[in-house]
Amino acid sequence: MIKVRIKKLDERAVLPMYGSEYAAGADLYAVEEETVGAGETRMIHTGLAVEIPEGYAGLVYARSGMAMKRGLAPANKLGVIDADYRGEVMVALHNHGRETQTVEAGERIAQLVVTPFLRVEYEAAEELSDTCRGAGGFGSTGSK
């Protein structure tokens, strides 16, 4: 198991916690109350800074219940915390619903998944190898 160092920037901040024994994502918590109007996006503070190990990234995902029941989900769909970022972890929550929503202090707002990744070298090419799919894009492989 890897260790992720966390600095509390606010005494009210709650360290990320897993909701179950096999959960992939640890819950992130709002440090203060924030109102998010219908169709609006607000930056929700966690009061935490993290030290993600080199070779890993922190991925911030929506909490399924919050998205389904209240229409609140990260505006960028997936947030990325790079290993060299040391600022406050914030979640840009967008209200997809028709009613104003209030995020309470201490409420779970997103999930943090820490995962390894590969860096690649991008190389310009005149041609790419042929495949059966070719340039077929959206919907090209069928619906079943």
Identify the role of each PLM range:
Residues 1-144:
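DUTPase catalytic domain/fold
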